[in-house]
Design a protein with these regions (language model features):
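Alpha-helical segments
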Residues: 1-263, 270-275
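Conserved small/polar residues in nucleotide/adenosyl-binding loops
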Residues: 288
Length: 288
């Protein structure tokens, strides 16, 4: 693993049954770098570096309490209108059954059946890597109010009407090296809530690039640019932040592993600066 891509990675031993020194109910904040979506950066929602907030149950509470807590936090603590929330659950396959239990938990919490969707492993199953702890997940989406892209518009279509805000993973399986699934010794809950995306929604912004983390850099780029290109401004701002966080954690540009990813981010950022016709020597003014 080149970078921490999810909050679960440091906790794998405890998901497998090892006792955590802080107990069975945890919360955490995790710096994450994901480069699988690097070519999507520049749109209204993708980031390479982001901060993930999570809460955990290590053999403690499971689906019903997890769903109830998530619904309460979103609607009561954050004040998100309940009618704006849609959810997805695992549709089931030959390996694991349909997750009707979680769907019923959502109905009990207050989500009507017409806003509960079922999808397969591509959308509602989580595993970090090819093997290890895994399980079905339930994702929470915010309806932005945009027009439907089609009659079949739903949270999985990617048109931008629905924005994912939280993901609860119910880790009750272990995928072995031979591709088989077996039950874990304990049932776990792993949740992940993207800080930047949630800030965007709570501040009434349309993209993460409008929140206070990015706005000063975005404004400076707009001041310096000679060519108006919103996607390039977003890429420069995002890759600058990502590169700085990697360097602060000890990363150095190179031709291999983590260093290559960092080098790639810097090169992409430099190309976009040139596209904006901004002198690359002015990058220090963006950092300050």
């Amino acid at each position: 693993v080149l970078f921490t891509t999810a909050g679960m990675q440091p906790l794998v031993p405890y998901l497998l049954g090892e006792k955590h020194p802080e107990g069975t109910r945890l919360t955490d904040f995790q710096k994450c770098v994901r480069t699988n979506d690097i070519n999507e950066v520049g749109d209204n929602r993708h980031l390479t570096y982001f901060e993930m907030l999570g809460n955990w149950s290590l053999g403690d509470y499971f689906k019903e309490e997890s769903v109830a807590m998530s619904y309460e936090f979103l609607t009561k603590e954050l004040g998100i209108p309940a009618e704006k929330i849609s959810v997805t659950c695992f549709a089931g396959d030959e390996d694991c059954p349909k997750d009707t239990v979680t769907a019923e938990c959502w109905k009990k919490a207050g989500i009507p059946e017409e806003r509960i969707y079922f999808f397969g492993k591509d959308d509602n199953w989580w595993i970090a890597g090819e093997e290890g702890p895994c399980g079905p997940d339930t994702e929470m989406f915010y309806d932005t109010g945009k027009e439907k892209c089609s009659e079949g518009c739903n949270p999985s279509c990617g048109c931008g009407k629905y924005v994912e805000i939280w993901n609860n993973v119910f880790m009750e399986y272990l995928k072995t090296s031979d591709g088989k699934y077996q039950k874990l010794k304990q049932q776990n809950v792993d949740t992940g809530l993207g800080l930047e995306r949630m800030a965007m929604l709570l501040q009434g912004k349309k993209t993460p690039f409008e929140i206070e983390i990015f706005k000063p850099v975005m404004d400076k780029l707009e001041e310096l640019e000679k060519v108006d290109d919103i996607a390039s401004r977003r890429i420069v701002a995002e890759h600058l932040r990502s590169s700085m966080m990697i360097i602060l954690d000890g990363g150095i540009p190179s031709n291999v592993d983590r260093g290559y990813i960092l080098r790639r981010l810097i090169r992409r950022m430099t190309r976009r600066l040139r596209k904006l016709q901004i002198d690359t020597n002015q990058i220090l003014s963006l950092i300050h």
